[in-house]
Regions:
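Short, small-hydrophobic-rich alpha-helical interface motif
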Residues: 13-14, 28, 32, 44-55, ...
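Σ70-family region 2.3-2.4 aromatic/basic alpha-helix that recognizes the −10 promoter
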Residues: 29, 49-56, 66-87
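Short, charged helix-capping/linker segments at alpha-helix termini
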Residues: 14-22, 33-50, 64, 158, ...
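Arg/Lys-rich amphipathic alpha helix in sigma70-family domain 2
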Residues: 38, 60-64, 75-96, 115
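Internal acidic/polar
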Residues: 2, 83, 91-119
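N-terminal module of bacterial RNA polymerase sigma factors
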Residues: 1-30
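A short pre-motif secondary-structure segment
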Residues: 136-140
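DNA-recognition helix of helix-turn-helix
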Residues: 78, 82, 142, 148, ...
Length: 184
């Protein structure tokens, strides 16, 4: 691969920072972008710009011609890539849960029970429970709310809701009408 920038051109452009930077950027930006992309940097374009912003003030101080310049540019690019990966490992990117992107193939026990039982059977099973237990299971399983949401609705703590749900499920497991649906 031939460089568009030669040692002679680099020497001739010393002192004219605008043209020198333009030539350096045109010569190396694509290579730096490719390097950062290959290394898995999440936003390689932004990091490429950061690399050249770090290189610009040091252009007059670089020795070794085009080879020394290339070494310096890729040293900066490597350091920025390492910094970016460290930053990502310390503060991972969070995404909201999107049910359409959920690729799990195993459904939950609650979902399987709902498929097996007709709505009237579910209501009959819930009659075995106390009012609070029935309300918790209805909100958690039928309405699909989180523990925190159920606690807020019922005016109880998260722990109380979890305990009510646990006791309700134990009560249901002990009834013969439920035993045919529940595997040991």
């Amino acid at each position: 691969m031939t460089d568009a920038l030669t040692d002679e051109a680099l020497h001739a452009l010393k002192g004219n920072n605008a043209e020198l930077f333009g030539a350096v950027y045109q010569t190396f930006a694509g290579q730096v972008l490719g390097y950062l992309t290959a290394k898995g940097v999440p936003d390689p374009e932004a990091i490429t710009q950061d690399v050249f912003l770090a290189v610009l003030p040091r252009l007059d101080d670089i020795s070794g011609g085009v080879h020394g310049l290339r070494t310096f540019i890729f040293s900066v690019a490597h350091a920025r890539m390492v910094d970016e990966h460290r930053k990502q490992s310390r503060a991972p990117e969070y995404h909201e849960f999107d049910p359409e992107r959920d690729t799990r193939e195993v459904s939950s026990a609650e979902a399987e029970a709902m498929v097996l039982l007709a709505p009237k059977e579910v209501m009959n099973l819930l009659d075995y429970l106390g009012d609070d237990q029935r309300e918790v299971l209805t909100l958690r399983i039928v309405a699909g709310l989180t523990v925190e949401q159920v606690a807020e609705i019922m005016g109880k703590s998260d722990g109380a809701v979890k305990q009510l749900q646990r006791r309700a499920l134990i009560t249901l497991r002990e009834h013969s009408a439920v035993k045919e649906y529940v595997s040991p």
